[in-house]
Amino acid sequence: MQSFMWIGFAAFFIASLTVGVRLVALWWRNRQLPELLIGLGVLGIGPVGFGCMTFGQILHGDYDTASRVVFGVGIFAASGGAFAKYVFNHTVYHPDSRAVRALATVAGAGLLACCLWEFSTGSSGIRDIGASYFIRTFLQVGCLLWGSIEALRYWRMMRRRTRLGLADPVVTNRFFMWGVGAGAAGVGTAIGITAQLLIGRPPLEIPWVTLSSSMHGLVAAVALWFAFLPTEAYTRFLLERAARHVQA
């Protein structure tokens, strides 16, 4: 069972690392802000943030000092990634909204304040579940679920245009997959933090929470991969399906 649980974590780590690096490399070539924001968001929350926090929990007990350092790096990385996703949601979906810009700014300030508080007090979310830990995780879940809703809303609009032959079916599907992936990551994180608050133990010490996180991570990994690294067969399927709908 333990080996099965780690499949989802490994898939999420590999997919988010590959996609994140690719998006940042794409930004380096074309200097488009959305690619940078989503790339940093994926890398920060995924392989760096999630990876370090998971490894920090594994080290806890035998190597407490190293555990806190590694977990702390994960906290800062995940918070930076979450802020990048808040800015992405504002830039891509509501670029002219002052209210959304203010929301992204407040979220970024909140994430930074929580990180600095936990760093200055030496607390962490491994065992120390304080207000800053709850707020930081809530903000992280918020950026994921908000991004999921926005992506799925955008997908619905573009799907109508695709049926008229006015939108790229591959790009349209990318929004759908991104919505599914972000939603899975957000729900998985929400379940984990809720269980930790109620039970008072790290998620990795609660078997059913570990399984839930692994399965949500697996869904997020598959969706992320098909969103940004679709296979030729899958791309061909999307194009052929769109062509049939246009002809009908």
Region spans (language model):
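C-terminal transmembrane-bundle signature of multipass membrane proteins
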Residues: 147-151, 174-248
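Alpha-helical transmembrane segments in multipass membrane proteins, preferentially the mid-helix core
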Residues: 18-23, 83-91, 141-167
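Extracellular-loop-to-transmembrane junctions of the mid-late helices
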Residues: 1-13, 114-153
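The cytoplasmic-loop to transmembrane-helix boundary for the fourth helix
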Residues: 88-121, 128-134, 168-180, 243-245
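Internal transmembrane alpha-helix with an interfacial aromatic "cap," most often the third helix
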Residues: 18-28, 60-61, 72-105, 119-123, ...
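Hydrophobic alpha-helical transmembrane segments of multi-pass membrane proteins
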Residues: 9-25, 29, 34-60, 77-82, ...
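Alpha-helical transmembrane segments of polytopic membrane proteins
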Residues: 5-13, 68-81, 131-143, 206-220
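Membrane-interface helix-boundary motifs at transmembrane edges
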Residues: 24-39, 63, 90-101, 161-170, ...
